[in-house]
Amino acid sequence: MAKESMKAREIKRAKLVAKYAEKRAALKQIVRTGDPAEAFEAAQKLQELPKNSNPIRMHNRCKLTGRPKGYIRQFGVSRIQFREMASNGLIPGVKKASW
């Protein structure tokens, strides 16, 4: 399992991304379409935003264990937890393949 501090860090990043999403999108739009002077100012303001408010810095982690690798997006858990939950019948509609 991942350390609690790593899980907390990811939660904090998610909150920052949500908080600054609109502001970041507006500034990026100005950088793309504005005249050079406005674009430069918008780029400066983008750099002043917190680093962790950038969605690129987020990493998918298992909701149960915090494991960063082997993440299954559709279910939000790692492959290990997915297999365990599917075997126990905790995920509706999932069963072992047979052909």
Swiss-Prot record:
Name the source's superkingdom: Bacteria
Segments traversing the membrane:
none
Give the keywords, sorted.
Ribonucleoprotein, Ribosomal protein, RNA-binding, rRNA-binding
**Which InterPro entries is this protein grouped with?**
Ribosomal_uS14, Ribosomal_uS14_bac/plastid, Ribosomal_uS14_CS
Any GO BP: translation
Question: Which Pfam families has this protein been placed in?
Answer: Ribosomal_S14 (PF00253)
Which Gene Ontology terms of cellular component type are present? cytoplasm; small ribosomal subunit
So which residues are the signal peptide here?
Answer: none
Give the protein's biological function: Binds 16S rRNA, required for the assembly of 30S particles and may also be responsible for determining the conformation of the 16S rRNA at the A site.
Listed NCBIfam families: PRK08881.1
As for family, the record states:
Belongs to the universal ribosomal protein uS14 family.
Fill in the subunit field for this protein.
Answer: Part of the 30S ribosomal subunit. Contacts proteins S3 and S10.
The identity of this protein, by name, is Small ribosomal subunit protein uS14
Q: Which organism is it from?
A: Bacteroides fragilis (strain ATCC 25285 / DSM 2151 / CCUG 4856 / JCM 11019 / LMG 10263 / NCTC 9343 / Onslow / VPI 2553 / EN-2)
Its ancestry begins with: Bacteria, Pseudomonadati, Bacteroidota, Bacteroidia, Bacteroidales
